[in-house]
Amino acid sequence: MKDLVNRSKRMSRRRLAPIRAGESIDYKNVGLLRRFISEQGKILSRRVNRLTAKQQRNMTKAIKRARILALLPFLNNEN
């Protein structure tokens, strides 16, 4: 009985979507891109940021483009 209660609590908890309906994945949207980069400047994995495979591919391309255009740093070595 206790397992059923615990299982139902876990199943009912829903996580919010990391990207809202109005937001688009674009290299110029630096505020959005920063949410998907670690403190060291690495791109977070799909498991961590809960994106779909297609969204993760687009996010990675946008982050790399923004880095090349110097909108985002390649590394964050601020101590």
UniProtKB/Swiss-Prot annotation:
Gene3D superfamilies referenced in this protein's UniProt entry, alphabetically: Ribosomal protein S18
GO cellular component: a single term: chloroplast
PROSITE patterns registered for this protein in UniProt: RIBOSOMAL_S18
Entry's localization field: Plastid, Chloroplast
Pfam families: Ribosomal_S18 (PF01084)
Keywords linked to the UniProt accession: Chloroplast, Plastid, Ribonucleoprotein, Ribosomal protein, RNA-binding, rRNA-binding
GO biological process: translation
Main location (coarse class): plastid
InterPro entries: Ribosomal_bS18 (IPR001648), Ribosomal_bS18_CS (IPR018275), Ribosomal_bS18_sf (IPR036870)
Keyword Ligase applies: no
GO molecular function, one term: structural constituent of ribosome
Family the UniProt entry places it in: Belongs to the bacterial ribosomal protein bS18 family.
Quaternary data: Part of the 30S ribosomal subunit.
Identification of the protein by name: Small ribosomal subunit protein bS18c
Species annotation: Chaetosphaeridium globosum
